[in-house]
């Protein structure tokens, strides 16, 4: 089952199973990691990432029980089984007196700049040259040996709720660890 289709299905199924407040978040993207040791690149990895996270409550206002988990969304049967177990588990958790339910009023959020840099998506093989530059600079500053990792990723996050929120955003990250 495709990620967004699974997300829509999960929300619908949880409503039918009696869940009250539901947030289903889908993340999909691609991650890259370059490792280096003794001034040499020793490993290059990349992988696709995708996951489906759920937060939900059951019960009545003032007596809500909450839980959250990540689920596998490979097929409808697997999803149904996991959702049934999640509802059963949540009904047996203590009442969460701190949770008052999801807000029902409509919010307008300002755009948050800087969480997505399209240059990260196009790094590709140039990530090796970034590593080489970092290693060379460390050597110029007196380091005899260097090691570390360069990790970067990008993707999309979509949030779907029982209060009719359906929003998504793109994200990117980059991190260099050098020692």
What do the PLM-derived regions correspond to, one by one?
Residues 30-90:
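N-terminal alpha-helical targeting/anchoring segments
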Residues 4, 16-17:
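Negatively charged, low-complexity tracts enriched in Asp/Glu with abundant Ser/Thr
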Residues 20-22, 50-54, 146, 172-176:
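Structural beta-strand/beta-sheet cores of well-ordered domains, especially the beta-sheet scaffolds
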Residues 25, 55-57, 149, 179:
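Residues in well-ordered beta-strands of folded domains
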Residues 16, 46-48, 140-142, 170:
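A generic structural signal for short, solvent-exposed coil/turn residues
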Residues 5-11, 21-33, 80-169:
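Acidic low-complexity segments
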Residues 165-179:
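Internal metal/ion-chelating core segments
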